[in-house]
Amino acid sequence: MSASKAMYQKLAKLAVVRGVNVQPNQPLVITASVRDYEFVRMVAKEAYAVGAREVIMSWTDTELAKLTYTYQSEETLTDIPDWKYDMVKREHDLGACYLRIHSDMPGALKDVDQSKVRAYQMAYSKKMKDLRKYTMNNEGQWCVIGIPSVEWAKVVFPHLSEEEAFEKLEDAIFMTSRVTEDSDPLENWRIHDGDLVEHARKLTELNFKQLHFTSELGTDLTVELVDNHVWIGGGDKTPKGVYFDPNIPTEECFTMPKKTGVNGIVYASKPLSYSGKVIDGFWFRFENGKVVDFGAKQEEETLKSLLNFDEGSRYLGEVALVPYDSPISNSNILFFNTLFDENAACHLALGMPYPENVKDGAHMSEEELKAAGANESSQHEDFMFGTKEMNIDGIQQDGTVVPVFRNGNFVI
């Protein structure tokens, strides 16, 4: 840590109080790299200060992951023991909240056997499928944040020394997370959330049938939205009314596309870090909601594996609007991390939708969600396609065209 300890303490408090908003006697589950133990201790201290029942750790280590994928057989990797399911089920039964701390190097697993990685991901996803709704339906609070590491910083700023790269990434993370020395991050987020909630309210009221996207990259895509869709921006609430901020940072307003209602071509505007590799220069062509053609300048086989993950991976689960004139975009930094990069540009997500994006969706069964037009998948992968010159038109139910974005920014 090169920034003052006070700055990291501010971020830790923000994550606990505003991010997951730990409640008295509620367990907090933290997923973090072993390298981040000092920051994790800060988070744990903040959690206990607000009355957390316990702090449960799920440690990760990239080097151990490489060894695991290199030396374990696929049979061993895909044999997910019942105790892992039971452990997560216990956390849910206790009403836990979840905090994930990102700091790993993008592309860290690029040299391991990707067939093993995919096999493990699919086996784990299948084992835990019925537990995913806990976070996807916001049954408990959850939040994702980022802190810098030298390994990550050198990918973002390869021409700088390790120390300079780390400090520059550190500054960028604090800035985009609205953590500063001379202000209260909790108040900063209260104001910011209010702005996003108001934008989402306006978009929901407009009740668009479709959105039409065009950009200088060649994107010409029409996305039909589900009936009774709901736009969400800023924080969210659990069924018990506990407010939390799922992403720190966030600049997006997002909703649910109709599974079979997407047509046209879309060109990604930023690379995508997926399964330990970085996919770049990629595009998709959709017909009746499904990706029917695609290409990539880098890691096309990895992109293919993403699309073939399961039956719903070639359909969209989310469409999100992010103005080009926003803190992350204005930083002109490519983070190679979806948490940050998705909040620099409009994005789409292949796979699983958020049920809350359709009216009463959190209370719907899987069949009811399907009937409403929702996609179904075990993964949710965001990719960025927003640009400086992106234009978006909203088509209302009566065919009226309403300009939504011009030259990358909101005009409503």
Residue ranges and their predicted role:
Residues 261-263, 279-281, 288-291, 314-318, ...:
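Active-site lining segments that contact anionic ligands and/or coordinate catalytic metals
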Residues 367-412:
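Extended hydrophobic packing segments that form well-structured cores
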